[in-house]
């Protein structure tokens, strides 16, 4: 009898010890699960509060906003300056070390060696087809040429403003411009753009939709053409598609990290007269021209004043980047 009682008591004690062990193990497991859950929750919460670059959001405004550089106090962070100049300049200077000389001069104005880049282009027309603006600040030097005044004006309008563009299928659709900020921009090796305005019955106004020869020529043999037609009227468009593309574009606002330096000429190009240029901030400047060395000396001397009317951007840009953005 005593043996049975001892066995019962021993079994009871073992059960208590086993239960206690199970409870402790369960508690530890629950603590592990809870802490892991809290860690994951806090991590996800932080991520949801951060900017998500993986979501393809629709564009509702300018993507070229000037961003504050959060690391601007670090000594290894510096602004970059791109100086675009015609090949004529380097040919006239004819000095293999002229860029190094200018870099040393920029250093005296607070621009460290290696922060200034010299970009050469053949001519204004070719440069307008693919203006690659990669630096925080971009200065484009254009020597005035009376025969290229229209090209200079259109190039200035193109690079001094941000454009949101969509491709156009002119073989299937008619197009109309909805306001002053809406333009058609054509680019290519040779662009000839013809338009035929249509009435409400889609009949040509002063032209025949079946005869391209009766269309109005708005651009002929150009590499860059910013086409402006009467707003609110459908147009049938004819274009040399083998050598040119055309896009339906809206001017969103100024591209404030770009400035144009007009070299020479009696008058300065003025695109601020365009009512679509808003705000009316002048970022086209003129310097006198006698020799290219004199031009570069002037730019070095006034570089910091020039940059003051600009805003630094945090991303690079090329024509493909902003032309195909939809």
Curated annotation (Swiss-Prot):
Region (GPR motif): 253-255
Signal peptide: 1-50
Disulfide bonds: 82-135, 165-249, 191-244, 196-207
GO molecular function per UniProt: metal ion binding
Sugar-modified residues: 69, 238
Source organism, top-level taxon: Viruses
Keywords from the named record: Calcium, Capsid protein, Disulfide bond, Glycoprotein, Host endoplasmic reticulum, Host-virus interaction, Metal-binding, Outer capsid protein, Signal, T=13 icosahedral capsid protein, Virion
PTM annotation: N-glycosylated. The N-terminus is blocked possibly by pyroglutamic acid.
Name listed for the protein in its UniProt record: Outer capsid glycoprotein VP7
């Amino acid at each position: 009898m005593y043996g049975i009682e001892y066995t019962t008591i021993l079994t009871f004690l073992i059960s208590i010890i086993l239960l206690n062990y199970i409870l402790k193990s369960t508690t530890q497991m629950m603590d592990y699960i809870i802490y892991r859950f809290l860690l994951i929750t806090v991590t996800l919460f932080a991520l949801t509060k951060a900017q998500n670059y993986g979501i393809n959001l629709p564009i509702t405004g300018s993507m070229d906003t000037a961003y504050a550089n959060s690391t601007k106090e670090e000594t290894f962070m510096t602004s970059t300056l791109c100086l675009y100049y015609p090949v004529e300049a380097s040919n006239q200077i004819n000095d293999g070390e002229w860029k190094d000389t200018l870099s040393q001069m920029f250093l005296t104005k607070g621009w460290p060696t290696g922060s200034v880049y010299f970009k050469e282009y053949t001519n204004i027309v070719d440069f307008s087809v693919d203006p690659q603006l990669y630096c925080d600040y971009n200065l484009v030097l254009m020597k005035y040429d009376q025969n290229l005044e229209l090209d200079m004006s259109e190039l200035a309008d193109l690079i001094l403003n941000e454009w949101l563009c969509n491709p156009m299928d002119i073989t299937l659709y008619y197009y109309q411009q909805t306001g002053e900020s809406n333009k058609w921009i054509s680019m290519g090796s040779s662009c000839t753009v013809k338009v035929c305005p249509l009435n409400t019955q889609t009949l040509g106004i002063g032209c025949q939709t079946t005869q391209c020869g009766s269309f109005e020529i708005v651009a002929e043999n150009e590499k860059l053409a910013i086409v402006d037609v009467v707003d609110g009227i459908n147009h049938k468009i004819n274009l040399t598609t083998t050598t040119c593309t055309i896009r339906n574009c809206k001017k969103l606002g100024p591209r404030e990290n770009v400035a144009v330096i007009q070299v020479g000429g009696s008058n300065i190009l003025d695109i601020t007269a365009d009512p679509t240029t808003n705000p009316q901030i002048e970022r086209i400047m003129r310097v006198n021209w006698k020799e290219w060395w004199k031009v570069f000396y002037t730019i070095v001397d006034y570089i910091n004043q020039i940059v003051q009317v600009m805003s630094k951007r945090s991303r690079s840009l090329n024509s493909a980047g902003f032309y195909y953005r939809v």
